[in-house]
Amino acid sequence: MSYFIISDGKEIKSFETAQDHKRVLEGDKGANTGGMGAYSPSRLLNQPLEEKILNKIIKPTITALEEMGSNYKGFLYAGLMIVKDEPYLIEYNVRMGDPECQTILPKLKTDLFEIINACCNENLQDINIEWNDKKSKCIVLCSKG
């Protein structure tokens, strides 16, 4: 599962989740890729799991960055594996994922510029990020090679 937040160094705002498909062939077969498709929201997420993700992974990471003198501003993308309702961090990226963001951004009702501007100016607490409740899919078409 892909879990996204944006932080202005003080405030954390969660974005929608997504689930990507890395294998080049149907049925989870073939070589790994950067992502052949995605859907949002992830069917794995529920309220108790989201609380675990925030409290065990995201918030401690932001706190550790602060303790190291880094006032992190921007997107943080946690690539997670969920085992028996427990989240395990596989990777972090400091960007939106692709193709995940192609499923997430169409669901965003709040102006993305306003969110990023608030992030840059340390005013995320003043932004209410709103989403539509639709589901979204993305399929990547690519050439062989």
Regions found by a protein language model. Give the residues of each.
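Internal nucleotide-binding/catalytic subdomain
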Residues: 1-102
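Active-site "cap" helix and flanking loop/linker of ATP-utilizing ligase/carboxylase catalytic domains
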Residues: 54-76, 93-145
